[in-house]
Amino acid sequence: MVCTEYPPIPGGIGRYTSHLTNALLKLGLDVYVVCDEKGDGQYSGLYPYNPHNSDVLLKIVNDLKPDIVHVQFEAGLYGLIWDTKNPRKVGTYIDQFYVKCKIPIVTTFHSGPITLSQWITPSSLVKKSGKMGKLGIPLRALLRYWKYFLNYQAFNNITKEKLRMSRAGIVFSHYMSKLLDHGSSSSRCHVIYHGSEPAIYPPLNKKEAREKFSLPQEDGHRIALAHGFRTAGKGWDILKKMNIPKGWTLVVNSSKDYYNKENLELSWQGETNILDLRRGYLREDELSTLFYASDAVILPYKVTAGSGVMFDALAHGLPFVATDLRFFREFAAQGLGITAKRNPHEFSKGLEDLRSNYVKYKEAVNMFKEKLKWDSVAKQHSTLYHAAARRE
């Protein structure tokens, strides 16, 4: 099992990998984890900025001789290499591992290719100064657009190339499967939902859970939770601009990504219906308590990703209000939440709509969450491992 990020290193992909590993061990599989030296895996040596990641993995595989190598893939976890002279050339520090490894590889893609509009924003193209062409178009912006476009194509090719070189790929939605596999008849990309289960069972009642975080206790008052790392991709910039509907409080809890140096500055000063817990990265029991204290999660994401927060929320019986991205649409179509255009007005309206039909959404979520149990998820992985190991 390969994942740079692994507990006690904080991070959603590391949490996921740890839970999956434990579930596979319960099935009787022998699982060995390779991670960062600060993680609790059996092997270490991986790091996002280590140009020798491939060599580290190849040596471990050669010594251990496993039946399957399972890589939890998010490009940033293994180091992105940008060629300034050739924008078409983008790679990672485990590319050579995929080329040279003789053992079948299964790769889980925690995010897929992104759209051009998500990759290139107007602010990334236009600076305050620049040479102007005859038509008044900033020449530097045009050149920058072309470079970003080439980078965009190359970046998306990273995930597609990893799938091509894997015996099998795993994604968390049918949309992500189609995006990566392009409708290929090879059926190389498999949908296995992101597992999640509460750390506390039986569930805490709402009153008790809210007391632990000093949250509003009024009867009928609902809490929408925004939880995760403080990165721009989470889209939290619209939260302060929302007109939070009557009867709702927005609760925010964020932490800094361990590897990502980005640390979005968020200020909720003067907001009476937004509570910032400032609790940072939570332990498993604390996170479950916070979900039990809430009624919904709010996910104003800017880019498509396999949202672990959404799956954690669903596992605790919470519907969502999320950006109208195709990933979230797939789950909204199953009655698990609402998608909205990514602006303050539409997200406020989404909370109102959720409240008016809350029982319907809650029932759908409670039925769906059975699919996220780790025992079921691990069995699907085990079946795929055996099929991948048999196939020549």
Language model: regions and residue ranges:
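A short, active-site helix/loop in glycosyltransferases that binds the activated sugar's phosphate group
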Residues: 149-189, 196-198
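A charged, aromatic-enriched C-terminal amphipathic alpha-helix characteristic of glycosyltransferases
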Residues: 356-387
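Membrane-proximal helix-turn-helix segments that form the acceptor-binding/catalytic region
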Residues: 91-100, 125, 130-169
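Conserved donor-binding/catalytic core segment of Leloir-type glycosyltransferases
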Residues: 216-234, 240-244, 251
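Nucleotide-activated donor-binding/catalytic signature segment of Leloir-type glycosyltransferases, i.e.
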Residues: 254, 262-289
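A short helix/loop element that forms part of the nucleotide-sugar donor recognition site in Leloir-type
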Residues: 202-217, 363
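Short hydrophobic beta-strand element within catalytic cores of glycosyltransferases
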Residues: 319-322
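Conserved acidic donor-binding segment of nucleotide-sugar-dependent glycosyltransferases
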Residues: 334-345, 351-358
